[in-house]
Amino acid sequence: MGIQNKDGALYFATGIDNSGLYSGRQEAMGIIKAMAGEITAFDVFGGIGISAGIAFAQAAKGAYEFEKQFQHSMKEVATLSSGIKGSLTDYMNQVVEITRAVPVSANEAAKALYQIVSAGHDGADGMKVLEVSAKAAVGGVTDTATAADAITTLLNAYKLDVSEAENLSDQLFTTVRLGKTSFGELGKSIAQVAPVAAAYGVEIDQVLAAVATLTKQGTPTAQAMTQIRASIIAVSKVLGDGAFDNRTYQEALAEVARQAEGSESKLRELVPEVEAVNAVLGLTGINVKEAAGHLEEMQDATGAAEAAFKEMASSAENQMKLLGNNITAALRPLGKEILKEISSAAQSMNEAFNDGS
């Protein structure tokens, strides 16, 4: 193992074919020069105050660190999916392509993909959910995994096809707009109510409209979910089997309130659970008109997620993230070759240690 000089750059002579690394270096230098040339009319490296060697070293280090971390995260996903394991390079490329249009990091996207695949959405379906979740994360100012958790929870609870992912994202964003909550809060608490609501036949738009109404009144998001869950169970006891078959959740609560005849004590007899009572009071009486209005808007939520994404993606911060993602994607050939070289060398050394033991 020695050191060789080639075109002013040093390489370890390990016996490993590093022609790919050399070509990757040449490609990276071309990319750096092209980008620098767009920025300054001076000498492409001198104009930004660094030498060509320093520029390459910085680019190489960044490309290597990115590829190492990204590969590790995607290999974690591959432990859950034989399909992804068998086409790992292709899926890595697909994830990177998403990040060239959506300002989230590839590593963040890979971590979210792990959650998505874990929730049962693999292959092309998983990638569809990932793209919707990444856009939702940008528009909702949260992380991709949190957005994915909310969307997959609803998909699974209501046994929906992934083609409904975008519609769910629209409804979640409409909840944020109408209520006093955030996408992150919804993502962390929607699982409290979704399975029960689905089991009793209460539709998603009705649940989310109720969340908007209750949180607008000042009820914390997690508590609103608890109230809705408790009221679904309680109302079904009062109205019997099929309580929600021919009426919305909001209409069912209004019927219970009607039976209470305006008496809070009678309401407590019908619905003993405190959280359930609070949901009835928060969605009927003086609040019934607003509750109905929120439900109507929820049923016309199409495009809400895309509008939020476009608004946030245009910010200077997110445009800089996108630029970073595009530069990283362009330098991946260099990062992959360095990682391959170092991994092969490390493997050879480990084998040598094992052989000598």
Protein language model annotation of sequence segments:
Residues 240, 251-328, 332:
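Hydrophobic, often aromatic-rich secondary-structure segments at membrane interfaces
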Residues 14, 18-70, 217, 234, ...:
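Preference for small-residue-rich
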